């Protein structure tokens, strides 16, 4: 962290320190739904909740430096309720339009839906997850081995190699797949040292419409890596 921070960020950090002492610490280690709701409402009033959300949804997105300062500060407090301070961000759904914006991004930002990110492939997979595009429908096959929050997410945004019925490569794509889709199964659930939960997921003839592609064909890997980069900045700050 730079030793000389801009005055504006110093003021925000001071405000966050007061928020920890006056709002979060008095609640203690409670982490039930009521306590989480109390922190979220207080965070909205203080303005922290909206710093991870797009302007078009009422957010006031902060700079990478400001978010890093705040995340480091909240993590240093070592209180479980700090994870409820920031509102849900768009994640892999950043800049989507149409159906994906209305039925997935908007509910995520409103806290009505949760999504997971499917990127990592198991070593034992015969080939990376792929989909056949035919007549506007995608038929998906494959596995993802480390999907954080996948057991309870409403949907997963998965990196998939797309081809036509003859096997010609069309490019990679991030595809939104509802967790309860026919053919999607959870093969294993496990936890990591930080207490977060993960699943191994399989796709067997999972069929979704072409309009579930995030962006355009060929943009899948760059979009996935951008999402990973944003998460790594968050984790490093914490």
For every predicted segment, state its role.
Residues 1-83, 103-107:
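Amphipathic, small/basic residue-rich leader segments at the start of a protein or domain
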Residues 3, 7, 186-238:
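Glycine-rich beta->alpha junctions and the first turn(s) of the following alpha-helix
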Residues 20, 47, 70, 97, ...:
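Buried hydrophobic positions in well-ordered alpha/beta secondary-structure cores of metabolic enzymes
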Residues 24, 81-100, 123-125:
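N-terminal glycine-rich flavin-associated loop
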Residues 96-112, 139:
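A generic, well-ordered mixed alpha/beta core segment in the N-terminal half of proteins
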Residues 110-120:
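A short, Trp-centered hydrophobic/proline-enriched beta-strand micro-motif
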Residues 130-132:
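A structural signal for short hydrophobic beta-strand segments in well-ordered beta-sheet cores
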Residues 137, 143-184:
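A short core secondary-structure module
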